Regions:
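Conserved N-terminal beta1-alpha1 strand-loop-helix module at the mouth
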Residues: 2-96, 100-104, 111, 117-119, ...
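Generic enzyme active-site microenvironment
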Residues: 41, 179-180
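Short beta->alpha connector loops at strand-helix junctions that form conserved
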Residues: 98-99, 145-146, 203-204
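A short, flexible beta-alpha/helix-coil linker loop
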Residues: 46-47, 147-151
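Acidic, divalent-metal-coordinating active-site segment for phosphoryl/phosphodiester hydrolysis
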Residues: 183-195
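Acidic, Mg2+-coordinating phosphoryl-transfer loop and its flanking beta/alpha structural elements
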Residues: 197-202, 207-208
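Short gly/ser/thr-rich secondary-structure transition/capping motifs
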Residues: 122-126
Length: 225
């Protein structure tokens, strides 16, 4: 399939709640909706798979009570199958697990899908895309980490772009969402969109912006340069 024949799904903006002020989460959720974003990206870290701890199931439950936005829950945890059921029960709309974090990836995917929730698989910067090739028919999204996971505000690792191009070709007629997480900014959004990535996770770029609504539009459509 040539690049001309590939139809990339519509662009979705997923502000990362990790970049918000944790003492003002309800306000942050309201702001995200006001900016025009469709999703909220929720990074759950356990201090084992990644060197940081963020929040757990209770926070997702509280987000669900306060917002009707799509909750994109990214489990940066070892053996995510231990926690999936509770995150779903508490209101997650999508669960993304790391290919590197679970021994039986297909079984873990089915654990999510069998509960009627969307499922994604994430791969770290050094993990090749063939780690997800065999499960593309069972998932809704591939998340490409464009920084080493564990902390917000890190610089963008550009070879996520080539991974996206190769993934689009690998997907053929079944074009899934491809999400990018890490170092997204107005400076690199054009090349990100050009690579076929269509779900944009942005933390500092939005929460530290002077005009978040305007910045979100740039992240959605590019700079026009």
């Amino acid at each position: 399939m040539s690049n001309q024949e590939i139809t990339v799904p519509k662009t979705i903006i997923a502000p990362s709640i990790l970049a918000a002020d944790f003492t003002r989460m309800e306000e942050a959720l309201h702001s995200i909706k006001e900016w025009g974003a469709e999703w909220v990206h929720c990074d759950v870290m356990d201090g084992m798979f990644v060197p940081n701890i963020t929040f757990g199931q209770k926070m997702i439950e509280d987000f669900r009570k306060k917002s009707d936005l799509f909750l994109d829950v990214h489990l940066m945890v070892q053996a995510p199958e231990r926690y999936i059921d509770e995150f779903i029960a508490n209101g997650a709309d999508m669960i993304t697990v790391h290919a590197e974090a679970t021994t039986h990836l297909h079984r873990t995917i089915l654990q999510v899908r069998n509960q009627g929730v969307k499922v994604g698989v994430a791969i770290n910067p050094a993990t090749p895309i063939n780690a997800v090739e065999e499960v593309l028919g069972d998932i809704d999204m591939v998340l490409l980490m464009s920084c080493d996971p564990g902390f917000g505000g890190q610089p963008f690792i550009p070879y996520a772009l080539e991974k996206s191009r190769r993934l689009r070709k690998m997907m053929g007629e079944n074009q899934l969402d491809i999400e990018v997480d890490g170092g997204v900014s107005e400076e690199n959004i054009d090349e990100i969109l050009d690579s076929g990535i269509n779900v944009i996770v942005a933390g500092s770029a939005l929460f530290k912006a002077k005009d978040p609504k305007k910045t979100l539009e740039v992240l959605r459509y590019g700079t026009g340069r």
